[in-house]
A protein has these predicted regions:
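Short, compositionally biased low-complexity segments
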Residues: 39-44, 224-228
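C-terminal accessory regions of radical SAM enzymes
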Residues: 229-281
Length: 281
């Protein structure tokens, strides 16, 4: 069971290198979805926090109060919500910190982008339709249940996410279905474009094989699909094999996009490296 702890912080608007806002807002520290491939696991601040990732959520109860003050002093034009947490995880239902933040941003006319994988975001459609939500990057995937149970056991089901994305699209809210991560030989994105008829595009990100816990991720995969052990070993060690695989994936996505007459972006990490986080554009 996830432990909730109420905490007070000294600042809520923090600079970000992600080009979706001048500042980032994280209403919580921690995320009970506990995804094994979450980038935040390697965050220096998070790594110093006692407790296993996913077992705790620090609720920043004074975040709305701070935001009211910092908007006046910092005058942000656009902010990002949820770079190191999911703003709509179950803790939000109890504390409604994100709800208060959205109300404040709307009141002051501050635009915002949102990163989430939670269908609970649809509960705030009324706030999101007030004209200041620029875009929601909604993380989706499509792998068999046994694989999901190993890699993101506490996250919302994929079908629930698909329904939430389409609900937001039906309400004319800007949403980017963000298929991430593409798990080699596991993720099924065939006909993915047709699953979101009102979306002009879908974006994709490949699994980052340089994550600090990549061996744990691979172990989880191999426990379900032992036949993939050799292939994942090659992805770690063989640059030519790695690059050829992802080139094939790109071609498959392009073929699907052309068939659906939709736009796309594909982000593939360099061998033993990262891609540049240029989401806006």
């Amino acid at each position: 069971m996830t432990e909730y702890k109420e905490v007070k912080i000294s600042r809520i608007l923090n600079p970000t290198s992600i080009d979706l806002g001048e500042y980032v807002i994280n209403p919580f520290m921690g995320c009970e979805y506990s995804c094994l491939y979450c980038y935040v696991r390697s965050n220096k601040v998070i790594s110093k926090r006692p407790g296993e990732w996913g077992s705790y959520v620090d609720v920043r109860i004074n975040a709305p109060e701070l935001l009211e003050k910092e908007i006046i002093s910092k005058k942000p034009k656009c902010v990002l919500l949820g770079s190191t947490t999911d703003c709509f995880q179950p803790a939000e239902r109890k504390y409604e910190i994100t709800k208060k933040i959205l109300e404040i941003l709307n009141k002051h006319g501050v635009y915002y982008h949102i990163l989430t994988r939670s269908p609970a975001v649809v509960e705030y459609i009324g706030l999101l339709k007030q004209g200041f939500c620029k875009k929601i990057y909604f993380t989706i995937n499509n792998v068999q249940a046994e694989v999901k149970s190993k890699l993101e056991p506490k996250s919302p089901g994929f079908e629930l996410r698909f329904k939430a994305v389409n609900k937001l699209l039906d309400e004319k809210i800007g949403v980017v279905p963000y298929f991430s991560p593409i798990l080699p030989w596991l993720s099924d994105f065939k006909d993915i474009f047709s699953m979101f008829p009102e979306s002009n595009s879908v974006e994709f990100e490949g699994l980052n094989m340089s994550l600090i816990n990549i061996n744990d991720i691979i172990s989880g995969i191999i426990s379900v699909r032992p036949d993939l052990q050799d292939n994942y070993g090659k992805m770690l060690k063989d640059k030519a094999f790695y690059e050829a695989f992802w080139q094939g994936i790109k071609k498959d996505i392009i073929r699907e996009a052309i068939k659906a007459k939709k736009n796309y972006n594909v982000y593939i990490h360099n061998f033993r490296g990262y891609f540049s986080n240029k989401y806006a554009g």
